Every structure is written in structure tokens, then in C-alpha cells.
Amino acid sequence: MKLNKRSVAHYALSDSPADHTGFLRSWGGPGSPPTPSGTGRRYWFVLKGNLLFSFETRESRVPLSLVVLEGCTVELAEAPVPEEFAFAIRFDAPGVRPHLLAADGQAAQEAWVKALSRASFGYMRLVVRELESQLQDARQSLALHRCASQRAVASCSKSQAPDHRAPDPENGHFLPRDRSSIGTVEERGIRPIGRDLTEWELQGPASLLLSMGQSPVSPESSCFSTLHDWYGKEIMELRRGWQQRAKGSQTENKSQNRP
């Protein structure tokens, strides 16, 4: 892997936030000579993304080393010195020595192992796949919940539908229980008993039914096409009566104009 040293050094010293920082003891690593056994060397480490920088001190302006955390694993290890909280960065490439590091305490050791294990792009890809799977499951669950809610609302609406029984006489008029008589009067054009022929012709079946306290609107005829056909028959009756009266007036005029 080829890197621009100046760009890498600028990134290491830039104001971009670091993912983890702290002092660690080092016993050598990839590309560096092995450190003699003993207490190791104490350096300041800075983790930014998948790049681990080491500095001589916290105030140093030049990084000593760089470890690219790809194709590697981070695991606990034994340090050359007892009572050291050590861990190792092991690479999959053959012949590459592990990078042995040690923290000042167990809490620092666990924090470093967690941060370094999550620094690679491979880990980020796994996280993205898991989040995508959770998002898909959440969307499916939400869709099922909405479908169940709509069914529950529809069922509740049907169970709470108003009762279309005949109202009390105090509230107005009665709705007929048997609509067959209405249809017979309407279809055959039979004049109801007690109604004058002129009134029947002028008002038509629908108007007379309304004046008699009978309404064509019912739960079974709530659609527009049914209501349109119902009141259209009234218009046809009115038009037929008008045509008959017009023919009668024309006949009278002709008879009067004869010598």
C-alpha cells in the first residue's frame, strides 16, 4: 500500500475528531524492529477511522508509525511483563508479526480492544447490513400493523353502524319496511289511492313518495348510480306529462282555428 506521508501526517494532526486516544506500551509491530523484552516503550496513540497513529509524546507533531486496521483481528494477549493488560493486532497476511500493545488498566484495555475491533470497513459493512435487515423488518412490521389497524377500524365501523329501524312517530315519518310496494307504484305508474291525477303527474313517483313520508334513500341504495336512476324516473314522468299537455294544447288550438 502506498501512502502520501505528508497527507497522512496532516490528517493525523488535523482538528478532525479522534475515535480514541491514550498511552499504550508497545513491543514492536509490522514494519518495525522488535522491541527488546521488558517494559516496552510508552507512546501516545491516536485512532482516526481505520488508521492508528503513534507519537513519541502527546505534544509531538510528527507521527512515528501508522497501522491500517484492515484484514486484521484484535484479541487479548500475554505481555512479556507480568501484570500488563496486553492485546495484539494480528494480520491475516503470512509472515507479518503481530502488533503487541498494553494498556495501563483493564478498563483502558477493554476500551482499546472495542475501539480497534470496530475501526475496519469490514465491521462497518456488517453493521450496515444488520441495520438494513432491522429496517426491513421494521417496515414489514409497520405494514402489518397498519393493515391490522385498518381491519379493526372497518370491523368497528360495521359493528357501530346506525340502526335503520323506523323512527318514533314523534320524530317525523315512518320508513317502510317493505319496499316492494314502492317499487310497484314506481314501476307501473299506478296512482296512489287518495291522490289526484294532476298531482301525480306533476310531482312524479319520487316526489310523492317523499311527500308521503317515504324516502328512496336506504343503505342498499347509497351509491350514486342507484340514486341517479331513482330520481331519473321522476324526471321521465314529468317530461312525459309535459309532452302530453303540450299535445293537448296544440289540439285545442287547431280546433279553435277551424272555421
Swiss-Prot record:
<comment type="subunit">
    <text>Forms homodimers and heterodimers with PHETA1. Interacts with OCRL and INPP5B.</text>
</comment>
<keyword id="KW-0333">Golgi apparatus</keyword>
<comment type="function">
    <text>Plays a role in endocytic trafficking. Required for receptor recycling from endosomes, both to the trans-Golgi network and the plasma membrane.</text>
</comment>
<feature type="region of interest" description="Disordered">
    <location>
        <begin position="155"/>
        <end position="178"/>
    </location>
</feature>
<dbReference type="GO" id="GO:0005794">
    <property type="term" value="C:Golgi apparatus"/>
</dbReference>
<dbReference type="InterPro" id="IPR011993">
    <property type="entry name" value="PH-like_dom_sf"/>
</dbReference>
<dbReference type="GO" id="GO:0005769">
    <property type="term" value="C:early endosome"/>
</dbReference>
<feature type="short sequence motif" description="F&amp;H">
    <location>
        <begin position="223"/>
        <end position="235"/>
    </location>
</feature>
<dbReference type="InterPro" id="IPR045188">
    <property type="entry name" value="Boi1/Boi2-like"/>
</dbReference>
<keyword id="KW-0967">Endosome</keyword>
<dbReference type="GO" id="GO:0030136">
    <property type="term" value="C:clathrin-coated vesicle"/>
</dbReference>
<dbReference type="Pfam" id="PF00169">
    <property type="entry name" value="PH"/>
</dbReference>
<feature type="domain" description="PH">
    <location>
        <begin position="17"/>
        <end position="121"/>
    </location>
</feature>
<dbReference type="InterPro" id="IPR001849">
    <property type="entry name" value="PH_domain"/>
</dbReference>
<protein>
    <recommendedName>
        <fullName>Sesquipedalian-2</fullName>
    </recommendedName>
</protein>
<comment type="similarity">
    <text>Belongs to the sesquipedalian family.</text>
</comment>
<dbReference type="GO" id="GO:0055037">
    <property type="term" value="C:recycling endosome"/>
</dbReference>
<keyword id="KW-0175">Coiled coil</keyword>
<feature type="coiled-coil region">
    <location>
        <begin position="124"/>
        <end position="150"/>
    </location>
</feature>
<keyword id="KW-0968">Cytoplasmic vesicle</keyword>
<feature type="compositionally biased region" description="Basic and acidic residues">
    <location>
        <begin position="161"/>
        <end position="178"/>
    </location>
</feature>
